[in-house]
Design a protein with these regions (language model features):
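N-terminal Rossmann NAD(P)H-binding glycine-rich loop of SDR-like oxidoreductase domains
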Residues: 50-72
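Mid/C-terminal beta-alpha module of Rossmann-like enzyme folds, strongest
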Residues: 27, 35-37, 42-45, 49, ...
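Conserved beta-loop-beta element that borders a ligand/cofactor-binding pocket
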Residues: 199-221
């Protein structure tokens, strides 16, 4: 136990030390240095060279634009080259996917080999109305993709993403009754028979990492969040819709993220 005199000396010493620290910045307690968390590395998607069939269609043009905006390069095989504007990163090849030789030309048109293929084909009609008379061969989409599959195999390309439709293949039972009648008893039936045949061919292809994207009713508009409703779309509503830009982004995303390989998926906004 300290005596009173010793206690006064200790208090005096502590007071002098505090005053000295206050008047001498060098002796002030320095703030503890903060260590910032390391920034997570940015995840960048490697650029790819894509072949797109159907690039001049409404959804195909948006798919092409979306892919180019992500620094991918594109080869587009189209019947009328003037239907697409010249754009950096875009190689346009004149031809039809019904001619296998034209697809082979498209594959050889760019210095870099094709990494993946996206198909946004639809059967041409007299007008933009889905009820108008078809002007393409009965199995235009199926036969085009058959040719594509042959050339893909020759070049060792495995990744294929196809824009199909809700109601094709095993998703037909999930349609509302009025839509079933519409798709099977109107001019739309030709397109769905083609989609069904294409669906079967893609599923039966060997050594192909395929994805069948089945959008519900297509409409115009910007990119919106996409709901994935499974292979058959059992929970899709009769009036569900999806914008073409949303579909375009989803198609490119499937290629970039390597998701849904060997799967079909119904998509809606």
């Amino acid at each position: 136990m300290l005596g009173r005199g010793e206690e006064l000396i200790r208090l005096h010493r502590e007071t002098n030390e505090r005053d000295s620290a206050t008047n001498n910045p060098a002796k002030k307690q320095q703030p503890t240095a903060r260590t910032l968390p390391k920034a997570k590395p940015l995840i960048s998607t490697p650029t790819m060279h894509l072949l797109i069939l159907g690039a001049s269609g409404r959804t195909g043009q948006l798919t092409t634009t979306t892919a180019l905006s992500k620094s991918h390069t594109i080869t587009a095989l189209i019947r009328n080259p003037s239907s697409l504007p010249a754009t950096p990163g875009l190689t346009i090849v004149s031809g039809t996917p019904l001619n296998q030789a034209d697809i082979e030309t498209a594959f050889a048109s760019f210095p870099h080999p094709v990494d993946a293929c996206i198909v946004t084909l639809s059967a041409p009609r007299e007008t933009d109305s889905p009820f108008s008379k078809p002007v393409a061969p009965a199995m235009f989409m199926r036969d085009s993709v058959r040719n594509l599959l042959v050339v893909m195999k020759q070049h060792g390309v495995r990744r294929l993403v196809v824009m199909s439709a809700f109601g094709a293949g095993d998703s037909f039972p999930s349609l509302a009754w009025p839509l079933k009648q519409l798709f099977r008893r109107s001019n739309m039936s030709f397109g769905f028979e083609d989609h069904d045949a294409l669906d079967a061919d893609v599923r039966g292809a060997e050594d192909v990492e395929w994805t069948l994207v089945r959008p519900v009713m297509l409409k115009e508009g910007g990119v919106k969040p996409v709901r994935e409703l499974g292979e058959t779309g059992a929970k899709a509503g009769m009036f569900d819709s999806i914008t073409r830009e949303s579909v375009a982004g989803f198609l490119v995303g499937c290629v970039e993220e390597e998701r849904l390989k060997g799967e079909a998926v119904v998509v809606a906004n």
